[in-house]
C-alpha cells in the first residue's frame, strides 16, 4: 500500500485547539465494522455500548512535562524535548534539541532549578543522547521546570490547564511525551458507570513516544520502520485478556497505544505475554488482529500510522467513509477532539 492511500481532506478549523469543557462531553461516532453502520452519541453515554462480560483495557501512562527551555554556556537559547529514557539510574534521555546551531558532544545546557544537561552523542531520528544532573529527584524537578508537550498542530503554548486536561484521570506511570488521547474523555464517574455494566477494566502501560509526532517518510508502506515504545503488561491484565479470548468474550482497547501493546505482546502464539518490552509493531490493512475486538479512539492525522492501524481494524473504505461523514458533521479532530467507538 502507498502512503497517499491514507490522505484525506480536513479543514483546519476542525482541528481542536482546546479540550471540550467537560471530559465526557465530546461527541462519539460509532462504527459497526461488519456492516459499516454509523451512529452518533456523546462520550457520557458510552457505557450503553458495552456488553456484560466485556474487558476494557486502558493505558495508565502519565505524560511528563517534556519540553524544557535552557541556555548554552555561551548564553544562546536552547529548547530540549525529552523523547524517552535511555538509562535509569543515570537519567540519560533521548532528546530533540532545537538551537541556532547543532550541539556538540560534551556541550552543556543550563536549565532551571540547577539542572544541567550534557549532550553525549547523536541518537536515532535526529535526536541526541543527553544526561541530566542532579539525578536524584529529576522527575520531580521536571514537573516544575518543564511544560506539557502539546502536539505541533495545537497552535498555542501549553498552559496550566493542560497539565490536567492533557492527562488521563487514571495516569500513573510517568514516561509518556504524548497523551493516550482516547483516554482523555473518561472521568472516574464514567469508568464506574462502565463497571456497573459488568465490564472489567484492566491497565497496562505504554509510554507514548516521539513516533506519534513523526511523519511517515516512505511512499511504499512496506519500507516503513516503526518507532519503538516501552510497554509493561501486568500479569493480572494478561490473565484477564487471555481468559476473555478463551471464553469468546470481547476485548475493548481504549486507544491505539493500548492496541499496539496488546498486539505486540501476542505476536508469538496469540496469547498475551505479561512483562515489559518495546513495541515496534506496525499495524496496517492486511493485519489480522489477535487480541483487540473493539476500539475507542480519536480521529487521527492524514497519512499517520495511527490512521493505518484504525483502518486495519475497521476496514479502510468504511473508516474513510466515517471520516468524510465526521468532516461533514463538523466533528473535532486529533488530540483534543472527538472520538470513535469501532466494534
UniProtKB/Swiss-Prot annotation:
It is an enzyme of class 2 (transferase). It comes from the Bacteria. GO terms for cellular component: cytoplasm. SUPFAM superfamilies: QueA-like (SSF111337). Gene3D superfamilies: QueA-like. InterPro entries: QueA, QueA_dom1, QueA_dom2, QueA_sf. Its EC number is 2.4.99.17. GO terms for molecular function: S-adenosylmethionine:tRNA ribosyltransferase-isomerase activity. Coiled coil: none annotated. It catalyses: 7-aminomethyl-7-carbaguanosine(34) in tRNA + S-adenosyl-L-methionine = epoxyqueuosine(34) in tRNA + adenine + L-methionine + 2 H(+). The keyword Transferase applies. Pathway: tRNA modification; tRNA-queuosine biosynthesis. GO terms for biological process: queuosine biosynthetic process; tRNA wobble guanine modification. It is found in: Cytoplasm. The keyword Cell membrane does not apply. Keywords: Cytoplasm, Queuosine biosynthesis, S-adenosyl-L-methionine, Transferase. Transfers and isomerizes the ribose moiety from AdoMet to the 7-aminomethyl group of 7-deazaguanine (preQ1-tRNA) to give epoxyqueuosine (oQ-tRNA). Belongs to the QueA family. Monomer. This is S-adenosylmethionine:tRNA ribosyltransferase-isomerase. It comes from Geotalea uraniireducens (strain Rf4) (Geobacter uraniireducens).
